[in-house]
A protein has these predicted regions:
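Short acidic/glycine-rich loops and adjacent helix/strand connectors
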Residues: 1-182
Length: 182
C-alpha cells in the first residue's frame, strides 16, 4: 500500500510517499523561510502564496523520488489542523483535487498527532550506517522500533507543545499543553 502524505500547516510545503504504513520512500520539503526572515517571523499570507507556487513541484518530486506513479497511490493523507488557515486550505484543496480526480481515498490528519506517529516510521538512511548508531536509534534491520501500548508521547512544536497518553493509536488523551502561541 502506498500513502501520499501532504503537509502545509505552516510555512513549509511537504509531500512524502510511505509504503505499507512505515517505510518512507520519499520526503520532499520546500521552505519559504527566506521570504519571512525580513519580517522576523512567519507571515501567513506569504506562506500560503509560496505553497500555491510550490506544491505541484513538491508533489512531482516526491512521486518521482519514491519510484511510483500517482495512479499507484492507494491513500492520500493531508494535514487538516492545527495550523495557519490559508496554508491548511492550500494542502487540503490540493489533496482533495487529486483524490476526486483519481478516485483515491482521502484521510485528513491532525498535525500534532502525526508527530507521535512519525516516531514509528522507518526513515530513509544511507546504506552504510554504523551498527552502534542503528542500535542506539532502535533500528533492527529494516524495521524501526514498535510502540508498546500504552505510552506517553511528548510533542515539542511551538505553541502546540503537548504531553499525551496514547492508549492506542485511535485513543489519544492530552495530559497537558503549553498556553503560549509560539
Amino acid at each position: 500500500m502506498y500513502v501520499l502524505g501532504i503537509e502545509t500547516s505552516c510555512d513549509e510545503t511537504s509531500a512524502a510517499v510511505v509504503k505499507n504504513g512505515r517505510k518512507i520512500l520519499s520526503c520532499v520539503v520546500s521552505s519559504s523561510l527566506k521570504f519571512h526572515k525580513k519580517y522576523g517571523g512567519v507571515v501567513p499570507e506569504i506562506a500560503s502564496r509560496m505553497q500555491l507556487e510550490t506544491i505541484t513541484q513538491v508533489l512531482d518530486s516526491a512521486i518521482k523520488e519514491a519510484g511510483v506513479e500517482l495512479k499507484e497511490i492507494d491513500l492520500i493523507s493531508v494535514t487538516s489542523g492545527p495550523g495557519l488557515l490559508g496554508s491548511l486550505l492550500v494542502g487540503i484543496s490540493f489533496a482533495k483535487a487529486i483524490s476526486i480526480s483519481l478516485g483515491i481515498p482521502l484521510l485528513e490528519v491532525n498535525h500534532i498527532y502525526s508527530h507521535i506517529y512519525a516516531s514509528f516510521l522507518q526513515p530513509q538512511r544511507p546504506q552504510k550506517v554504523r551498527k552502534e548508531r542503528e542500535e542506539f536509534c532502535g533500528f533492527r534491520g529494516d524495521l524501526a522500533t514498535f510502540a508498546v501500548l500504552p505510552f506517553i508521547g511528548l510533542v515539542v512544536s511551538g505553541g502546540h507543545t503537548s504531553l499525551f497518553y496514547v492508549r492506542d493509536f485511535k485513543k489519544i488523551e492530552t495530559l497537558g499543553q503549553t498556553l503560549d502561541d509560539a
